[in-house]
Amino acid sequence: MTLTASSSSRAVTNSPVVVALDYHNRDDALSFVDKIDPRDCRLKVGKEMFTLFGPQFVRELQQRGFDIFLDLKFHDIPNTAAHAVAAAADLGVWMVNVHASGGARMMTAAREALVPFGKDAPLLIAVTVLTSMEASDLADLGVTLSPADYAERLAALTQKCGLDGVVCSAQEAVRFKQVFGQEFKLVTPGIRPQGSDAGDQRRIMTPEQALAAGVDYMAIGRPVTQSVDPAQTLKAINASLQRSA
């Protein structure tokens, strides 16, 4: 077990904002990152960027002071998922996720793989229902539950397996906090500041609404990454959240 970056080497942020990076060019991504302050947000690296640029890109972001949510949504047989989660922990990321639909044995194996990392283990989060999915999409998969009901079923399984929380839509957050308690972390994509384009998300909410709903961490992408002044945009979002708290 070799941690590449300890939390003590990175900036401390109390912001719930996680900026979702979405770049095809590594230099463009780093150019954007160099415009913002790690005290104002964390960063999310997904499948495309990790496939293009690899673990070294994550290390470069960490060296700039950022906590990293490695959003790879592992979904495999238990042993493979466990090894993947342990590899993410070795990389020193702040958060990593798996698909709850992988089942209880897979999620339990992933959680157990993090035990050797102790306090340096990343948060382990499960994905419930992707925010782009509607009831008709679930019906195509043979799921007759609504997105909200199916997400709650998967969230209950996630908590039973001892994970730290779930990725869910902001609309589900109020219910989830009531059912699963304050310590069960809720991570929400589809967050758009007032006036932003909805993009490819179907179930969206503003940062202020998300905070009021009980969201712990909110992923915000293009409204920040495509801003002419991303640092100021982040500061404005954080200021509005502080006023709403």
UniProtKB/Swiss-Prot annotation:
Q: Does the keyword Cell membrane apply?
A: no
Q: What is its EC number?
A: 4.1.1.23
Q: Which Gene3D superfamilies did the record assign?
A: Aldolase class I (3.20.20.70)
According to its UniProt record, which residues of this chain constitute the active site? K73
Q: Which purpose does this protein serve, as stated in its record?
A: Catalyzes the decarboxylation of orotidine 5'-monophosphate (OMP) to uridine 5'-monophosphate (UMP).
* Reactions accelerated catalytically: orotidine 5'-phosphate + H(+) = UMP + CO2
Please give the organism: Shigella boydii serotype 18 (strain CDC 3083-94 / BS512)
The gene from which this protein is expressed is: pyrF
Q: What is this protein called?
A: Orotidine 5'-phosphate decarboxylase
